[in-house]
Curated annotation (Swiss-Prot):
Official protein name in the record: Nodulation protein D 1
Native source species: Bradyrhizobium diazoefficiens (strain JCM 10833 / BCRC 13528 / IAM 13628 / NBRC 14792 / USDA 110)
DNA-binding region: 23-42
Keyword Cell wall biogenesis/degradation: no
Task of the protein: NodD regulates the expression of the nodABCFE genes which encode other nodulation proteins. NodD is also a negative regulator of its own expression. Binds flavonoids as inducers.
GO biological process: regulation of DNA-templated transcription
Gene encoding the protein: nodD1
Ranges for domain HTH lysR-type: 6-63
Family: Belongs to the LysR transcriptional regulatory family.
CDD domains assigned to the protein according to its UniProt record, in alphabetical order: PBP2_NodD
Segments forming a coiled coil: none
Molecular function, one GO term: DNA binding
Record keywords, A-Z: Activator, DNA-binding, Nodulation, Repressor, Transcription, Transcription regulation
């Protein structure tokens, strides 16, 4: 199909190369031979009068002209997919949709297990790909590479729609055998004790506790930095270290490890976990259905404030 002299199939090839940054991988992605993909790129270069890609080692690096085309082309292809190809009514029991979700280990353990358990009953063929925190989550949404973000609201941009899931607070956690810990933690103890702290993404972004301390000019003794809250508890056992983590996750581990939950001696901020999706998914039946499930389970959890029953070991 042509539009103003451009074969629209070439836009699929352009999008594939922009994503893969490799001619062979891009050709494989859209079921073309490598010579056919090379010919498609040559035709695109002629049409746009731009080199589009240059080689750097084994990677194809887009020119500024290709970068300018990438967003509009990706959005156009996604709109076609959602408006034409995916417009059929959704039957959850028969759906084999795969949802790609960026969320923290905290939300995976405390919240998303509910979703997986529910889908096993209502939509057993639905699949999930749960991804760790990205340094550029908004870009992944914009490119349609993920279906949902489940993150603290302050990490979300205003470029896409979002909905509140629930509020959460931070608590301190230590080994139950730690004789330095009483039911009340003093500020002096908090500052002087060794800490295990979580940071996120490749850039190791600080968590909310770290932001609060930096903002108030406070420093503590950090002994271990881990990627994710769920790695904190094992590093507290049989030590005098403490860690700070979301209350619901602390309760989860308190039932499984000899840990003690203590209120922090300073007013650490609460935060809101939220759900965000690409704006072009607003009318996608599968996205609408999954958003309803996510919001229902968040409401159920907030009202009951209990985690799902522990499964029996296999």
């Amino acid at each position: 199909m042509r539009f103003k002299g451009l074969d629209l199939n070439l836009l699929v090839a352009l999008d594939a190369v922009m994503t893969a940054r490799n001619l062979t991988a891009a050709a494989r992605k859209i079921n073309l031979s490598q010579p056919a993909m090379s010919a498609a790129i040559a035709r695109l270069r002629t049409y746009f009068r731009d080199e589009l890609f240059t080689m750097r080692g084994r990677e194809l690096v887009p020119t500024p002209g290709a970068e300018a085309l990438a967003g509009p082309v990706r959005e156009a292809l996604l709109h076609i997919q959602l408006s034409i190809i995916s417009r059929d009514a959704l039957d959850p029991a028969q759906s084999s949709r795969r949802f790609r979700v960026i969320l923290s280990d905290f939300m995976t353990i405390v919240f998303f297990r509910r979703i997986v358990d529910r889908m096993a009953q209502e939509a057993p063929a639905v699949r999930f790909e749960l991804l760790p925190f990205s340094d550029e989550p908004d870009d992944l949404l914009r490119r349609g590479e993920v279906d949902f973000l489940i993150l603290p609201e302050l990490f979300m941009s205003s470029a896409h729609p979002k909905a509140t899931l629930f509020d959460e607070s931070l608590v301190c956690v230590g080994c139950r055998a730690n004789k330095q810990l009483s039911r009340q933690l003093t500020f002096e103890q908090y500052i002087s004790m060794g800490h295990v702290t979580a940071k996120f993404g490749r850039a190791l972004r600080p968590n909310l506790e770290e932001w609060f301390l930096l903002e108030h000019g406070l420093r503590r003794r950090i002994e271990v930095v881990v990627q994710g809250f769920s790695l904190i508890p094992p590093l507290l056992l049989d030590t005098s270290r403490i860690g700070t983590m979301p209350l619901r996750l602390a309760r989860h581990f308190e039932k499984r490890m000899p840990l003690r939950i203590i209120q922090p001696p300073l007013p650490l901020p609460t935060f809101t976990e939220a759900l965000q999706w690409p704006s072009f998914h607003n009318t996608d039946p599968a996205s609408i259905w999954m958003r309803r499930i996510l919001l229902e389970e968040a409401s159920n959890m907030a009202s009951g404030d209990q985690e799902p029953p522990t499964r029996r070991r296999c």
